[in-house]
């Protein structure tokens, strides 16, 4: 049985079959979620203390740490990072191909 290898697009969500816009939206949300989780871990915060810092409930922190990406908007994640004292900035680049 031959194994087929496909070159990645650089976006795991695109590779999984999501459209370009949806894949990019998911990529941004996942990166923001990862950064929030790293911040909580680096500061050694429990879910309850993290919730107080970020202005959300403990179950929301549980959703965050469990990767429930569908439960968070980019706006919400940016607000949470802001409450933790993190300034979010984006670098925008042009895609190589536009369909």
Where are these regions (language model features)?
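Short alpha-helical DNA-recognition segment
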Residues: 44-62
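Amphipathic alpha-helical interface surfaces
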Residues: 28, 32, 57-60, 73-77
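DNA major-groove recognition helix of helix-turn-helix/homeodomain DNA-binding modules
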Residues: 74-91
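DNA major-groove recognition helix of helix-turn-helix
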Residues: 65
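N-terminal flexible/basic segments that precede or flank functional cores
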Residues: 1-34, 99
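Short, charged recognition helix plus adjacent turn
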Residues: 89-99
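Short, amphipathic alpha-helical "recognition" segments used to contact nucleic acids or chromatin
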Residues: 29-45
């Amino acid at each position: 049985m031959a194994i087929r290898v496909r070159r990645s697009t650089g976006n795991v969500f695109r590779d999984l079959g999501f459209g370009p816009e949806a894949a990019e939206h998911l990529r941004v949300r996942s990166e923001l979620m990862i950064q929030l989780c790293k911040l909580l871990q680096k500061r050694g915060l429990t879910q309850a203390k993290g919730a107080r810092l970020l202005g959300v409930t403990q179950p929301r922190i549980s959703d965050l740490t469990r990767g429930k990406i569908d439960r968070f908007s980019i706006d919400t994640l940016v607000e949470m990072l802001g409450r933790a004292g993190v300034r979010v900035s984006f670098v925008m680049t042009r895609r190589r191909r536009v369909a």
